[in-house]
Regions:
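Short, charged/polar surface micro-motifs in flexible loops or helix N-caps
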Residues: 38, 60-62, 85-87, 105-108
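A hydrophobic/aromatic-rich effector-binding and dimerization subdomain
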Residues: 3-4, 11-27, 91-154
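Short acidic-glycine-tyrosine-enriched beta hairpin
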Residues: 69-83
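Conserved hydrophobic/aromatic beta-strand scaffold that supports enzyme active sites
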Residues: 32, 55, 79-81, 100-102, ...
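Well-ordered beta-strand positions in beta-sheet-rich domains
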Residues: 71-73, 87, 132
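Short beta-strand His + acidic residue motifs that chelate non-heme Fe in jelly-roll/DSBH
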Residues: 64-66, 82, 87-93, 99
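Generic protein-terminus/edge-of-domain signal
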Residues: 1-66, 70-73
Length: 157
């Protein structure tokens, strides 16, 4: 699994998950995780925080998802953006599946000369609360097909 649980000194009662750079043997800075594969972690405690950026695409089920006490109703086609350190809470029983594109800031910084590139992305600005958008069915289908293709064929190589 690509999540590491560690004790968070600032928020002792909230699990913190760390990006696992060597999941496939060599170092990586980006990964795609299928939501149904992380439910076992959410069964322990659906409230958690991450040390990396997360763009979650919901493909099945409807429910609620909260980030830093801001609750969002989500359904298939919704995309949720979150930053490191935000407190997240999943409605794990109703949000059935989807994909999370997870990455560290180092991933984007390695491709762009601007060290603050990720902060310039509107959904990841330091003072902005998390955001949710809804994609049209045709756009979400294309994105999910691409994610599925890369997840199955590229990450398994």
């Amino acid at each position: 699994m690509n999540w590491f649980y560690d004790a968070c000194p600032m928020k002792k009662s909230i699990p913190r998950y760390t990006f696992y750079k060597h999941k496939y043997g060599s170092e990586l800075l980006v990964d795609v995780v299928e939501l149904k594969n992380i439910k076992k972690f959410l069964d322990i405690n659906p409230v958690h925080t991450l040390t990396y950026y997360d763009i979650t695409f919901v493909t099945e089920g409807s429910g609620s998802f909260s980030i830093d006490n801001q609750q969002y109703d989500v359904c298939p086609g919704d995309v949720i953006f979150s930053k490191p350190g935000e407190i997240r809470n999943w409605d794990k029983d109703h949000i059935i599946n989807g994909y999370a594109l997870i990455f560290e800031e180092e991933f984007l910084s390695s491709f762009f000369k601007d060290d603050q590139f990720v902060q310039h992305l509107s959904y990841f600005e330091p003072d902005k609360t998390a955001a949710k958008i809804h994609l049209s069915e045709s756009v979400s289908d294309r994105i999910f097909q691409q994610i599925f293709f890369n997840h199955i064929f590229c990450f398994s190589c």
